Amino acid sequence: MRTEPDGRWSRRAGLMLAGALAGALALLGSVRAQGLGLPDLVERAKPSVVLVGTYRETDSPRFTFAGTGFVVGDGLTVVTNAHVLPDPSQPADGRVVQVHTWQGGREWQARAVRVHVVARERDLAVLRLEGGPPVPALTLAAGPPPREGSDLVFMGFPIGGALGFAHVTHRALLASITGLVLPQVRGQALSPRAIRALRDGPMDIFQLDAIAYPGNSGGPVFDARTGEVVGVINMVLARGTRESVLSQPTGITYALPVALLHPLLNDLPR
């Protein structure tokens, strides 16, 4: 005797199948995001991440690398750390700030720049390219900061030219969003930079679970999910403030949130 399947079971089975299919598609999407998203992000970001240093006719080599920068806005604005630039308190010695942009392979192009603004209390600087075509620009995150535990990526030139100038990418976890200066630090343990930071009010920074090296300073930190820039690697500001209580600074990497950068870009083309 032939029996007809129960309608309720058919509907339930259909819902189960649809749920399983949706879960599989979500998992596939996650795998694709993790497996293909990062290579795409790296490929897209490399032309926008630049060498920052100084040029002097009598130096050998004439270009001296100092740190990483990245292009935003209209393709003529470069962001980096203030400490990457020559110290303005020192006598002029003929050095000028210069940026080198990647042309593919091992080719780099020197570009003249002018310093637009320097915020030393935030250790951020904004440069403007002079002459030549715009450079592909990165997108700055405009919303709230990423949540602790988020997957991040940062790019730069660790160890500078010692290993050759090649973009290097690192994965990182946002381990903590923490204050720049510990409130319990005694006044005599603070550097002048830390005292200025306290005077200017609280400032949150990102603590990452990856190690950045000299040369990474000024480089972009990306949200691995969206590809937007959420921070700027900084290897100096936190060492002179948050870690001033330590006799031996740690290998922890810090980054400045882009919220500190946005006010410096208000009068520039977007």
Regions found by a protein language model. Give the residues of each.
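Active-site region of chymotrypsin-like
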Residues: 45-62, 130-138, 168-266
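Bacterial N-terminal signal peptides
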Residues: 16-27
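N-terminal export leaders
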Residues: 9-16
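Short, well-ordered loop/turn sites that connect or cap secondary structure elements
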Residues: 72-73, 91, 146, 224
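Catalytic-histidine neighborhood of serine endopeptidases
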Residues: 73-120
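Active-site substrate-binding loop(s) of clan PA
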Residues: 40-41, 88, 116, 130-166
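A conserved glycine-rich beta-strand in the N-terminal activation segment of trypsin-fold
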Residues: 36-38, 55-81, 111, 218, ...
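Sec/Tat signal peptide C-region and signal peptidase I cleavage site
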Residues: 30-33
